[in-house]
């Protein structure tokens, strides 16, 4: 198993990030749903149980176009989708991913904590001693780290917010100076139980499936600040319902077009 803790310093308050993250997820879901792949929202409802109290979501992520054509052609449909279950008890969140094709041989879980500060909390997720020994800490810089796919409109080094006047984040040491400031801590467990492939696949999952996705998503999150700033949680729930209906319609249209 490969365990990494990603830390992202952001020029936001913890309260602002709650709205920003939910808005970003809804918008990114719509952007990624096209041509036979995308996201289907199964559940989005409150929960109150042993995991805490918050919002529970269940999604299916379709990957057909993310794989080489030959792989998509030979793999069963169960290998082309990922199931996501998330418990958002903000500021703590937990997300679990599974793939029906691999069953228990593929494990991916993400625990998140959101706190004020510049990434200085050494055990934000309250890990035990054994986990701390295995954990690799990786700071993600949303301005200076380069994603695999560059989008000019989502570049914090050149973006300036009209509503908040935050940005551009063009100082190499912006994380030491920016106000307001918070950190998103994400503890990621990745395990692929296939002898001979384990280390390589776990590294790919962490580097491409998690780190690059987090980097791109949070670059966009900051650059979309003028879209979400001032929204309430009620506004977000309405956007989520509209997104759920829109995604369902897109997926049905895609299925019909691919028949």
From Swiss-Prot:
Q: Which InterPro entries match?
A: PI_transfer, PI_transfer_N, START-like_dom_sf
The encoding gene is pitB
Q: Name one GO molecular function term.
A: phosphatidylcholine binding
Keywords in alphabetical order:
Coiled coil, Cytoplasm, Golgi apparatus, Lipid-binding, Transport
The job of this chain, per UniProt, is described as: Catalyzes the transfer of PtdIns and phosphatidylcholine between membranes.
Protein's UniProt keywords contain Cytoplasm: yes
Q: Which PANTHER family match?
A: PHOSPHATIDYLINOSITOL TRANSFER PROTEIN, PROTEIN RETINAL DEGENERATION B
Q: Which domain of life is it from?
A: Eukaryota
| Compartments in which it is found | Cytoplasm; Golgi apparatus
Tell me what this protein is called: Phosphatidylinositol transfer protein 2
Cellular component terms per the entry's GO annotation? cell periphery; cytoplasm; Golgi apparatus
Q: What is the lineage of its organism?
A: Eukaryota, Amoebozoa, Evosea, Eumycetozoa, Dictyostelia
What family is this protein classified in? Belongs to the PtdIns transfer protein family. PI transfer class IIA subfamily.
Query: Pfam families of this UniProt entry?
Result: IP_trans (PF02121)
**From which residue to which does any coiled coil extend?**
231-259
């Amino acid at each position: 198993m490969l365990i990494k803790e990603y830390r992202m310093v952001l020029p936001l308050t913890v309260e602002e990030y709650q709205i920003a993250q939910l808005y970003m997820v809804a918008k990114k879901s719509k952007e990624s749903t096209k041509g036979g792949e995308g996201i289907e929202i199964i559940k989005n409802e409150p929960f109150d149980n042993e995991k805490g109290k918050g919002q529970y979501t269940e999604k299916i992520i379709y990957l057909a176009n993310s794989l080489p054509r030959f792989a998509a052609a030979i793999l069963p449909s169960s290998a082309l989708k990922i199931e996501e279950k998330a418990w958002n008890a903000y500021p703590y969140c937990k997300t679990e991913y599974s793939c029906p094709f691999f069953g228990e041989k593929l494990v991916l879980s993400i625990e998140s904590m959101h706190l004020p500060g510049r990434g200085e909390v050494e055990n934000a997720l309250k890990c035990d001693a054994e986990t701390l020994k295995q954990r690799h800490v990786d700071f993600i810089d949303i301005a200076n780290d380069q994603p695999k796919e560059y989008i000019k409109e989502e570049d914090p080094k050149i973006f300036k917010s009209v509503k908040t006047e935050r940005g551009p984040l063009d100082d190499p040491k912006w994380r030491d100076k920016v106000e307001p400031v918070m950190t998103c801590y994400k503890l990621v467990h990745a395990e692929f139980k296939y002898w001979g492939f384990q280390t390589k696949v776990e590294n790919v999952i962490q580097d491409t499936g998690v780190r690059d996705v987090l980097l791109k998503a949070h670059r966009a999150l900051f650059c979309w600040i003028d879209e979400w700033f001032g929204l309430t949680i009620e506004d977000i729930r309405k956007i989520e319902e509209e997104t759920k209906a829109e995604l369902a319609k897109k997926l049905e249209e895609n299925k019909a077009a691919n028949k």
